[in-house]
């Protein structure tokens, strides 16, 4: 699904989907294009953008700019997740769990693009329900932002990291 992988400055950019949409008016149809993109630094920062324009390149450019403005931080454990996580948005539900070194990214389509630009290299994941790319991207980013490192949990509870990990 990811059609473009460009190293622009310090960000990895991926184009997930381009769609032609139409508006029906008295004189006929007006066609425009939508683009869904994800941007990340490959080290725990990721964002997505959705752009719409009369031409494909303009839609992609708008989506990339929105993605750069809409970035969130993710607490990674090396190149995998801290713990198994679930996320949902609308009808899409995603489940991701950390994997051992050498596993790779076991994910489909839109979820794979988000994980790649976020810097996750080893993960097992599954998407349930709707596989609409926009909802899957939102669900994946929601899940990643809900993930907490042991240090964060320890700070919230007022305990040491060793006590949290057992």
Swiss-Prot record:
Question: Which PANTHER family has this protein been placed in?
Answer: MITOCHONDRIAL RIBOSOMAL PROTEIN S5 (PTHR48277:SF1)
Q: Report the protein's function.
A: With S4 and S12 plays an important role in translational accuracy.
Cellular compartments per GO CC: small ribosomal subunit
* Example of a GO biological process term: translation
What is this protein called in UniProt?
Small ribosomal subunit protein uS5
Q: Name one Pfam family in it.
A: Ribosomal_S5_C
Q: Which family does it belong to?
A: Belongs to the universal ribosomal protein uS5 family.
Record comment regarding domains: The N-terminal domain interacts with the head of the 30S subunit; the C-terminal domain interacts with the body and contacts protein S4. The interaction surface between S4 and S5 is involved in control of translational fidelity.
Keyword annotations for this protein, in alphabetical order, are:
Ribonucleoprotein, Ribosomal protein, RNA-binding, rRNA-binding
Subunit comment: Part of the 30S ribosomal subunit. Contacts proteins S4 and S8.
**Domain S5 DRBM as annotated: residue spans:** 11-74
Tell me which InterPro entries the record gives.
Ribosomal_Su5_D2-typ_SF (IPR020568), Ribosomal_uS5 (IPR000851), Ribosomal_uS5_bac-type (IPR005712), Ribosomal_uS5_C (IPR005324), Ribosomal_uS5_N (IPR013810), Ribosomal_uS5_N_CS (IPR018192), Ribsml_uS5_D2-typ_fold_subgr (IPR014721)
Question: Whose protein is this, by species?
Answer: Alteromonas mediterranea (strain DSM 17117 / CIP 110805 / LMG 28347 / Deep ecotype)
Q: Its Gene Ontology molecular function terms? A: rRNA binding; structural constituent of ribosome
């Amino acid at each position: 699904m990811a059609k473009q992988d460009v190293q622009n400055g310090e960000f990895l950019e991926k184009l997930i989907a381009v769609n032609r949409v139409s508006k029906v008016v008295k004189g006929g149809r007006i066609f425009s294009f939508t683009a869904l993109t994800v941007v990340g630094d490959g080290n725990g920062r990721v964002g997505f953008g959705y752009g719409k324009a009369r031409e494909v390149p303009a839609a992609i450019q708008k989506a990339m700019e929105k993605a750069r403005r809409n970035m969130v931080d993710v607490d990674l454990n090396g190149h995998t997740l801290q713990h198994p996580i679930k996320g949902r948005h609308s009808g899409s539900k995603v489940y991701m769990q950390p994997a051992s070194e050498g596993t790779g990214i076991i994910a489909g389509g839109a979820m794979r693009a988000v994980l790649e630009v976020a810097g996750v290299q080893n993960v097992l994941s599954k998407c349930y329900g709707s596989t609409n790319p926009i909802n899957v991207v939102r669900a994946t980013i929601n899940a990643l932002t809900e993930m907490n490192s042991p240090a964060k949990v320890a700070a919230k509870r007022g305990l040491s990291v060793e006590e949290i990990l057992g």
